[in-house]
């Protein structure tokens, strides 16, 4: 069952990515992304990131965190151990996020929200509660959204200065 969820989530994320990128205007250049890693030093701490800004690599243990959801509940990643977990890093100012969230709602959340082996958390990057609630309402999402003040959770998974949207399957 977990593999089925992973497959559905992977296909949905791939479709969302292709759809989001398909809006390029004719005549725009395609950019080839290198897979080299980049080393960034911040506050005497060296961080290895890939060319897209990800710090966490496939096969590595996902960094634990505790997040406060918009309903006031607290959830830690470690409490979800054994489940398929999707983290959707987002923000109200992110145009791609606004486009993908209704698809995540329909194609992933509504299909799997009652599955005890699945969890989805939207993680809003550095915005206040009222803005996150308005964002959820405007995009029509009902899946859990959490607050990431200072983008500290985001920084465990990707470089702070790298872009969002970012989706992580664990």
Language model features by range: what are they?
Residues 62-63, 85, 164-165:
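Short loop/turn microsegments at loop-to-beta-strand junctions
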Residues 87, 121-123, 168:
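Conserved hydrophobic packing residues within short motifs/helices of P-loop NTPase cores
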Residues 83-84, 99-122, 137:
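Conserved helix-turn-beta segment immediately C-terminal to the redox Cys motif
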Residues 2-62:
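N-terminal targeting signals for export/organelle localization
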Residues 116-129, 141-151:
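Thiol-based oxidoreductase modules, predominantly thioredoxin-like and allied folds used
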Residues 75-98:
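Short active-site neighborhood of thiol/selenol oxidoreductases, capturing the structured segment around
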């Amino acid at each position: 069952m977990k593999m089925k969820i992973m497959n559905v989530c992977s296909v949905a994320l791939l479709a969302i990515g292709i759809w989001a990128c398909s809006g390029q205007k004719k005549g725009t250049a395609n950019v080839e992304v290198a897979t080299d890693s980049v080393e960034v030093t911040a506050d005497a701490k060296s961080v290895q990131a890939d060319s897209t800004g990800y710090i966490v690599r496939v096969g590595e243990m996902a960094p634990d965190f505790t997040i406060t959801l918009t309903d006031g509940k607290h959830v830690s990643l470690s409490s979800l151990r054994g489940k398929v977990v999707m983290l959707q890093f987002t923000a109200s100012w992110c145009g791609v996020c606004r486009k993908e969230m209704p698809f995540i709602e329909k194609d992933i959340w509504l299909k799997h929200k009652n599955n005890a082996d699945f969890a989805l958390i939207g993680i809003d990057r550095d915005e206040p509660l009222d803005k996150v609630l308005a964002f959820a309402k405007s995009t029509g999402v009902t899946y859990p959204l959490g607050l990431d003040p200072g983008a500290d959770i985001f920084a465990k998974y990707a470089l702070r200065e790298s872009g969002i949207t970012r989706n992580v399957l664990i």
